[in-house]
Structure formats: structure tokens, C-alpha cells
Design a protein with these regions (language model features):
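Transmembrane beta-barrel wall of Gram-negative outer-membrane proteins
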Residues: 214-328, 336-338, 361-372, 621-623
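Short acidic/polar hinge/loop motifs at secondary-structure boundaries
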Residues: 139-167, 217, 224
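Gram-negative outer-membrane beta-barrel transporters
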Residues: 704-706, 723-832, 904-906
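C-terminal beta-signal and adjacent terminal beta-strands/loops
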Residues: 501, 706, 823-830, 855-909
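Short loop/turn motifs that connect adjacent beta-strands in outer-membrane beta-barrel proteins
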Residues: 173, 189-196, 231-235, 299, ...
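N-terminal periplasmic "start-of-domain" segments of outer-membrane beta-barrel proteins
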Residues: 60-95, 121, 129-132, 139
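Extracytoplasmic beta-strand/coil segments of soluble accessory domains associated
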Residues: 76, 101-140, 167
């Protein structure tokens, strides 16, 4: 029903915009003979002059705030030679949203996945972050995450001036992805041309309140920007700082799983166990940005870009988990009620809940530096040399401690398909006289601790030469090369926790008690809470855990990629129709290697260092054509061959091997350092109608991507002689050829979709509506790719078939207000699962509504503005579910994060 309403809304919007277009459409006149006789170089100079004059006129009428951001983004879209989407700052240090990920997620065909209530990863046209790349000022960036996909909450929106998402390739664009390329851009001080100082402060509050003792539900955000020019505008400086101190409060329920049982003669899905947790998080991020530009002459300009971000998260989770399935726990079932194929409610007798007090800490550091040099050798020749480095480090500690009662308990359970289930226990789990530190689940440990570490470093150098032409068809040619070297490593140490007194149950010291966690959302009054870190330091000892699963998390991947390219820039006439764009080709060669461990026969103590790799190359042609049918109407076409490099955890050299005694042959499984990239051929077509002199637009686009290969696990023939087999003496197979299961380049498939977008300032239609406006988008994407291999049914990770966004705003006389909604249908997403590994989950579709209202003062208070924001207005839940062929969908996880209120002020002078 939600999707039907969205589709109806978009249909009505389309009809309205068609009428708007017809009101303002003008008959296109043929280009005059003077324009047709111009060379491409002269037409380009004329276009730049007209763009500069347009920008000058905008400054004269002082377009500010919401409309300034919209019009700047439209201008970027209109002038680009690729099919792009853009977000532009409304003012210095002020993008439309508090998070850059949320701003990007409002663009047509893009969607964000929430992690702990925050938008972090972005899907472009139905493809997850693994298929895109992220640039900062045109330079490839590394990630503090598990793979290549950038976590966008590392980049404060206050330090960025714009974001451009390239949906079609350009031969000289660095490290492009199959789904798209996201370029985060900081301000250019010499282009701004004036001194600006901006100060911003906001108070933040979470509506959920304090879930865990010791955690505030309030926080703040502050930022400062300074931009200036010196030495007769030959030196420009931009400095920025942004701090985020933000609370996170989560009410969370997870299911262990379901078993199909016959209950009262009916087949029913039986909830096997549950986790009821309250999670509180402290998020502290400091971001720094510096830009120094130097343009001492008409023949040289240089720019030094520096970016640093440190993000510290401390998260405490408290609550309980309880096994419910009688065959596993020895419990007994009473009063069962089955509805819709699900055991809706029941009483479970003789259960033993495990009380959890966990603490997770994560520290991410990102540093990027780049030095760009541009040279003008003559009226026709220019050059560029750019050197950069990007580095990320991530350190985590994941600590679990367990407690429980000495005896067993009873519980009444009621399951809710679209909300929190409720649990009514017999015991009081806040009572320190009842609860002890112990192993109530019989897991053989009293706790557990993990220390994952990631390091990712990329260095690159880029050289480009450009030649302008006095041609009626081609404006010039660009050619050059980019060299990059990247190393990403992961390591982890893990240990069991044992209570110091020989693992005997221990009472919780009174000086460690801090109250109880609020778990009332699931019917549980509370769960005992204590200082997790201090308990770990004083009450437990560690017992190192070494096994094959842990060694599989210890790897390093090295890759050197060299890209050479040539691009012919098109600027001519097709009859009376101006045509611009480019025709390019690039050759990408990659040399990759991975180091890890090979584990024989599951014996981790006998692990062997193992190294493997490969090299390959791809020729990637690309074409972008822009047909200017009239001054308002543009048709764009793009075609290209594309690649996205494989996931780094799939490239790991780690593996295990042994003897299959049944088949009497070698067998094993692991990563694949010889993986080649995902490869695709793509086609794009877009129609754009720019309204009211570029203040609004309507666009419709269609795309087709033919993935020639996809990476999924396959069992292949493998020569095991690459390993040391001397440790095997019994039942040794006669041949070293056996069967090995690993990620492999296999069958691909197609992805198709269409997108519709619009932006209409109503004041251009009727003066009485001055200040009102609306913008939005709708996309429909379908895929025939089977990510688990032929014959499987799981959809492509990151793909929501339907994605829509709409924003309505009013801005006039200093007053502004805006309400936005972004929605996506159900999809497969990635989360951090058991063992700190990545897991895929079915995630329910969601609608997120944000609201803001503000006022910008004038007169003697000119430069001061105030703002009130409410994010996640409806407290939209995050839901996961189980989906299997032949079974009903079963609720897997239900989380609520609360609303976020922000009240603040900005002063610019």
C-alpha cells in the first residue's frame, strides 16, 4: 500500500509537471549562422562566459538558502558532460542535511542503509557500495569499513561544498565503479573570491531518553569555517573544523531463528530464542579540512588539500537473551496460540535467560592529502600533475559478559510481526541478590572479547595533458595516466573470558552496580546493569581462542592499478542541434596479491603462511553525448564498458584444506586472491527539461547494465600442491587435484531501471506562490543477477526495487521551512554479524521523514540565522526478517532509534 501511494504521488507529480512544462515551453529556433560557424573552442569559451554571467546575475538577486543549494545543483547537472546528480551547499558550511549520507540518499536512484539509526552506506541504482567508488576532490578514498565501500558518516557535511554522483563514466575520471562514482568536494577559496567566516552550533536531543545508565540523551554539534584570499588574490586559504558529539539510543529485539513445528494439528513457525537489548552510544567525531591554493601566474596554479577525521564510538548494550525451543533448552510449552502460520503466543516453563552487559569501542581515523598542479603551456596545451595519499585505521574492542539466576524461570511470550514482542518473566532480573556473574547458557565461557583491526592505505599519482582544437566538431583531447598502490589488512585477536575464581559464579560487587537498563519496550521492567569495563579488568581472566575461523580474519591484500586513458572532447553541430560530450578509452591493468594462512585439517596451530595473486587488464571505451534540442531541453546518451574491483575479504588468501575420506580426494575452501573484477556494459538515456532559466527542471532517465560476470561461491577443480601436504599420512589421495570452494567469477545478468526527477519553484508559475517549491524523484530498478549463483532466488544486495524522495519547502523574507521524505522498498543489506564478520540480511522497506524550520536575520543582525530540525519525525523502525522459499516471512529484528531534535544558530560574516 505504501508503494502504491508513492507511485500515485509520482504519477500526479508527473502530470502536474507536464502542464508546467507546456505553459513555459517555447518553440525552438534554429541556431543562427554565426553559432554554426564557430569552432568548438569558440563555442566552449562562449558557454563559459554565459555561465559566468548567469552566476553573476544570481549574485545580484542574492539567491540564498534552500533555493541557492537547489539552483547550484541544477547548474552542475546542466553543465556536466556526464549524467550526474548533485548536492550543493546552501551556504558556507551548510549542506541540506546534518549527515552527508542523508543528503546523498535524497538524489534520484540512490538509497541509504541505516546502521544504529544513522545513514552510513549508499546504494546507487540498486547496487551496493562495493560497486561504487568514492573520491575526495577527484581522488580515490580508502575505507575504514570491511571492504571498499566508504562509510559516509566519516565525512562531516559542514566541511563539504558539494557532492557530485557520476552515473555514466568519463575516461579521465579516477577509479570509476559500475554503479557510479561519488565525488565529495571541498570549497575552492580562490573561486569564492571573498573572505568568509562561518560559525555554527547546534544542541541535539534524542526522544528515546536515557536507555542505559551513564549515557546522556543530549549532545551537540559545532563547526567553524574560514575562507580568505591574499597577495592580490593569488593565494587562497580555506580552513574548517567540525565536531559531532551525538547520543544514540536504541531499543532492540532480535530473533535466534525459527523451527517449523506441528502444534495442535497446525504447522507453525516456532521462535527458538530472543534477544532483548537496550543500546546506548556515544558518537564523537572531529573533522578537519584545509585547502591552500596558489595561482601566481596565468601559467600555473596549485592546490594542497588536507582532510582528517577521527570518529570514536563507545557503545554499551545491556539486556538478556533466552532460548525458547524445547528441544534445545529442555523447556516445556503451554497455552500455545497459532495465527497465520506463526506461534503467536505461549508460555515456556523452565527456561534460563542469559543476562548480557556488553561494551563495544570503535576508533576510526581517516587522513587524506593531495597536491594538484595545473600548467598552461600555450593557448592550446595544458597539463596537470596530482599526487595524493589516503589512509584509514580502525581499532575495535567487542566485549561480552554474562550473568543469570541460579535457577530456572518461566515466561509468557507474545510475538508481534511488526513491532516488539512482549515477555513476562517470573523473576526480577534487576535484583542483585538474585543475579550472579556466571555461564547460565552452558556455553563454556563467562564472556568473550574480540579486537578487530583494519588498516587501509592508498597512494596515487596522476598526469594529464590536454590539447585544445580549432575544430568545428572537437574542442580538444585529454590523455594521461593514473598510478595507484593500495594495501588493506585485517587482523583480530579473540579470547574467552573466565571468572577468576575457577569460573565459579560470583556476586556482582556493589561498587560496580549502576542501576538497570530500560527494556520496558519488550515488557521486561529492566535488567541489572554494571560497569562492564571495570568488571572485565578486575573479575575476569582471558583464555586465547585460536581456530580456523579466527585465522580467516587475518589477511592482507596488495594491489597496484595503472590506468592510461585518452578522451576526445566533442563540441559540434548535428544539423541545427548543438552536440557536446566525449569519446574516450581507458586501459586498466591490475596486479594483486594477498597474504594469509592456510589451515590443514582444521588444525589452527599448524597454519601455514600462504600467498597468491594474479594480474589482468581491461580496455574500457566510453561515450557521452549531450544533444541541446533547445535552450531548455537536453537529451543525454551514455555507453561504456565498466569494471568494479572485487571485495577485499573475498580476495583474501586464507583457506582451509584436508582430505575428503568419502571421495578420497583433497578438498577445501577459502578466499580467492585470483579474483578478477565485476565487468559490465552499460547504456544510459536521459531527457532533461530545464525550467525558468535553470531554476527548476524535469528529467526522465533509463539505464541498462549487463553484468558479464558476478562473483559468488563455486566449487572448482584445484591443485592442492600449492600447499604443504606433508602433515597428512593416512588415506592420502593419489592425486593433488581436488575440489575447492571459493568466490569465483561466474555468470552475471542484467540490471534495468528508470528514474524520474523534478524540481519546481512555484513562484515562477504564480507570484502569489513565491517562496514555495517542491523537488523529488522516483526510481524503479529490476535485476536478473543471481548473487548466489544460477538457480538461486536471493536478490542483489543493496537493491530496492522502488526508491523515492520528495521535499516540499517554503523560503521567503528570511523565514524557511522544509519537510522531506525518503523511502525505499525491502532489500538485502549487510550488517556486522557474529564474530565481527559481514552478514547479509533481508531488511524491510522504510520511510524516513525529516523536518526543519529556520529564520535568517537581516539588518544589524545580518549573517545570523537560527534553525530547528527534527530527524526521523515518525520514529520509523528498522526491521529485518527471514525469507525462505516455501515458508512465511518471519520477523528477525525490530529496532527503534527515536527522533533527533536539533536546535542551533549560524553566524557568518
Amino acid at each position: 500500500m505504501k508503494l502504491k501511494r508513492n507511485m500515485l504521488f509520482m504519477a500526479l507529480a508527473s502530470a502536474s509537471l507536464m502542464m508546467v512544462g507546456s505553459v513555459h515551453a517555447q518553440t525552438a529556433a534554429a541556431a543562427d549562422s554565426q553559432d554554426q560557424s564557430m569552432t568548438a573552442k569558440e563555442r566552449e569559451a562562449k558557454r563559459k562566459a554565459e555561465a559566468a554571467e548567469k552566476a553573476k546575475s544570481l549574485d545580484v538577486v542574492e539567491v540564498t538558502g534552500i533555493r541557492r543549494g537547489i539552483e547550484s545543483a541544477i547548474n552542475l547537472k546542466q553543465e556536466s558532460t556526464s549524467i550526474i546528480e548533485a548536492v550543493s551547499a546552501e551556504d558556507i558550511g551548510k549542506l541540506p542535511d546534518s549527515s552527508i549520507a542523508e543528503s546523498i540518499a535524497r538524489l534520484p536512484g540512490l538509497a541509504a542503509q541505516r546502521v544504529a539509526g544513522r545513514a552510513t552506506t549508499i546504494s546507487i541504482r540498486g547496487l551496493a557500495g562495493d560497486f561504487s567508488t568514492t573520491l575526495l576532490n577527484g581522488r580515490e578514498q580508502v575505507s575504514s569499513g570491511d571492504n571498499r565501500g566508504v562509510e559516509f558518516d566519516q565525512y562531516p557535511s559542514e566541511l563539504l561544498s558539494s557532492v557530485v554522483v557520476y552515473k555514466t563514466p568519463d575516461a579521465n575520471l579516477v577509479a570509476q565503479g559500475i554503479s557510479g562514482t561519488v565525488d565529495l568536494q571541498t570549497v575552492r577559496p580562490l573561486s569564492l573570491g571573498k573572505r568568509v567566516v562561518s560559525l555554527n552550533a547546534r544542541y541535539e536531543k534524542n526522544s528515546t531518553g536515557e536507555v542505559n545508565p551513564g549515557y546522556d540523551d543530549t549532545g551537540y554539534r559545532i563547526s567553524a569555517s574560514y575562507i580568505d584570499q591574499f597577495a592580490d588574490n593569488t593565494i587562497g586559504v580555506a580552513l574548517g573544523f567540525a565536531r559531532l558529539d551525538s547520543p544514540g539510543q536504541t531499543e532492540r529485539w532480535n530473533a535466534w531463528g525459527y523451527e517449523t513445528q506441528t502444534i495442535g494439528g497446525q504447522s507453525a513457525e516456532f521462535l527458538t530464542g530472543s534477544q532483548i537489548y537496550g543500546t546506548s552510544t556515544s558518537n564523537v567525531r572531529d573533522g578537519l579540512m584545509a585547502v591552500i591554493e596558489w595561482a601566481p601566474s596565468d601559467t600555473y596554479s596549485g592546490a594542497l588539500d588536507i582532510y582528517y577525521s577521527q570518529f570514536e564510538r563507545v557503545e554499551t548494550t545491556r539486556g538478556l537473551e533466552v532460548g525458547l525451543f524445547p528441544a534445545w533448552t529442555g523447556s516445556t510449552l503451554a497455552n500455545p496460540v497459532v495465527a497465520g502460520g506463526l506461534l503467536q503466543s505461549a508460555t515456556l516453563n523452565s527456561i534460563r535467560p542469559v543476562l548480557r552487559n556488553d561494551e563495544n569501542k570503535r576508533d576510526d581515523d581517516i587522513f587524506a592529502i593531495g597536491f594538484k598542479n595545473e600548467f598552461t603551456f600555450s593557448d592550446y596545451w595544458t597539463g596537470m600533475a596530482d599526487f595524493s595519499m589516503s589512509k584509514a585505521n580502525r581499532d575495535e574492542s567487542i566485549l561480552e559478559t554474562y550473568a543469570g539466576a541460579a535457577g530456572r524461570d518461566n515466561v509468557n511470550v507474545t510475538v508481534d510481526r511488526n513491532g516488539f514482542p512482549t515477555f513476562d518473566f517470573g523473576l526480577d532480573y534487576t535484583d542483585p541478590a538474585t543475579i550472579q556473574l556466571r555461564d547460565p547458557g552452558g556455553w563454556g565461557q563467562d564472556g568473550y572479547v574480540k579486537y578487530p583491526e583494519f588498516e587501509d592505505k592508498l597512494t596515487s599519482a596522476r598526469f594529464t595533458l590536454s590539447r585544445a582544437f580549432d575544430s568545428a566538431t572537437f574542442s580538444g583531447i585529454d590523455f594521461g595516466a593514473n598510478w595507484s598502490k593500495r594495501t588493506k589488512s585485517r587482523a583480530v585477536a579473540e579470547a574467552f573470558l573466565d571468572l577468576r575464581n575457577g569460573r565459579a559464579p560470583a556476586s556482582i560487587p556493589s561498587d560496580l552496580l549502576v542501576g538497570s537498563v530500560n527494556t520496558g519496550f519488550a515488557g521486561v521492567p529492566g535488567v541489572i546493569s554494571y560497569n562492564v569495563g571495570e568488571a572485565f579488568r578486575t573479575l575476569y581472566q582471558t583464555r586465547t581462542n585460536i581456530n580456523q575461523d579466527i585465522l580467516n580474519k587475518d589477511w592482507e591484500v596488495d594491489e597496484t592499478v595503472i590506468t592510461s586513458f585518452a578522451k576526445l572532447n566533442i563540441d559540434g553541430m548535428l544539423g541545427n542541434v548543438p552536440v557536446r560530450g566525449n569519446l574516450g578509452v581507458s586501459y586498466v591493468s591490475a596486479d594483486q596479491e594477498s597474504e594469509g594462512f592456510a589451515v590443514p585439517g582444521g588444525n589452527a596451530s599448524g597454519a601455514q603462511p600462504f600467498k597468491a595473486g594474479t594480474d589482468y587488464g581491461d580496455v574500457l571505451p566510453s561515450l557521452n553525448l549531450i544533444f541541446s534540442l533547445t535552450d531548455e531541453q537536453t537529451v543525454r546518451f551514455g555507453a561504456a564498458k565498466q569494471v568494479s574491483r572485487p571485495r577485499m575479504d573475498q580476495m583474501r588468501a586464507n583457506n582451509g584444506f584436508g582430505i575428503d575420506t568419502t571421495r578420497r580426494e583433497w578438498s577445501g575452501g577459502g578466499g580467492n586472491p585470483e579474483l578478477e573484477p565485476w565487468r559490465a556494459t552499460s547504456f544510459d538515456l536521459s531527457y532533461e527539461y530545464y525550467l525558468f532559466g535553470g531554476k527548476g527542471y524535469v528529467s526522465a532517465a533509463a539505464f541498462h547494465k549487463d553484468l558479464k560476470s558476478y562473483i559468488y561461491d563455486q566449487t572448482v577443480e584445484f591443485d592442492f600442491s600449492v600447499f604443504d601436504l606433508s602433515g597428512f599420512t593416512a588415506n592420502v589421495p593419489p592425486s593433488t587435484i581436488g575440489r575447492f570452494t571459493r568466490p569465483t567469477n561466474g555468470e552475471g545478468g542484467s540490471i534495468n531501471g528508470w528514474e524520474f526527477a523534478f524540481s519546481v519553484p512555484f513562484g515562477e508559475i504564480a507570484p502569489v506562490l513565491d517562496g514555495f517549491g517542491i523537488l523529488g524523484s522516483y526510481s524503479d530498478t529490476r535485476s536478473a543477477v543471481r548473487p548466489l549463483g544460477p538457480g538461486t532466488s536471493q536478490p542483489l544486495p543493496g537493491l530496492s526495487r522502488y526508491v523515492s524522495n520528495v521535499t516540499a519547502y517554503y523560503e521567503r523574507g528570511g523565514f524557511s521551512t522544509r519537510i522531506s521524505q525518503r523511502s525505499r522498498s525491502a532489500f538485502i543489506g549487510e550488517i556486522q554479524g557474529f564474530g565481527a564478520d559481514r552478514e547479509t540480511r533481508y531488511i524491510e522497506g522504510e520511510k524516513l521523514v525529516d523536518f526543519q524550520v529556520g529564520y535568517a536575520f537581516g539588518g544589524e543582525w545580518d549573517g545570523l540565522s537560527v534553525i530547528l530540525q527534527v530527524n526521523n519525525v515518525t520514529n520509523e523502525a528498522y526491521q529485518e526478517f527471514y525469507r525462505d522459499s516455501g515458508r512465511i516471512d518471519r520477523p528477525r529484528s525490530y529496532n527503534e532509534y527515536g527522533r533527533t531534535y536539533l536546535l542551533g544558530a549560524t553566524y557568518k560574516f
